[in-house]
Amino acid sequence: SHWNAAEMGPHRDIMGDLLVEAERAGMTLGASSHRVEHWWFLGHGQEFDSDIKQPMHLGDYAWPAMPERENQDLFSEPMPTDEFLTDWLLRCCEIVDRYHPRILYFDWWIQHSAVKPYLQRFAAYYFNVMESRGGCVINYKHDAFPFGSGVPDIERGQFAEAKPFL
């Protein structure tokens, strides 16, 4: 996409700058990704007068969003396409390759059934790349990963249901 800080402004690599300064200060760099939600999230902007109108094209600031009946449903349709999920996977790998964040936070919707195989491939890639750099941690929501294999995000101070004690 051309919608990035280097091309659209402020014409520099903000994440790269953060990496340099974090290392200089002895801090750990973390990153977050909310991209998988682009499958449907910006589609709601078409429900009222906004700047998110069809036709959108690949390379626009967001993926051409699909209508989503129920974004909490793990099997909701339309399912993300292989093209979309491959794009998501490559963008996540680019974050790892360029910035080597020790912590990577994913917001919800990575637990969708269509995302699971791509998420597994990403986690294997991330853990393998970062092993020689001292390891890494994935933060996730809901049941995107088996309990104990990453750091679950706990919002509002508690889980919605009981979880095993480790």
What name fits each language-model region?
Residues S1-L166:
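Mature catalytic domains of secreted/periplasmic carbohydrate-active enzymes
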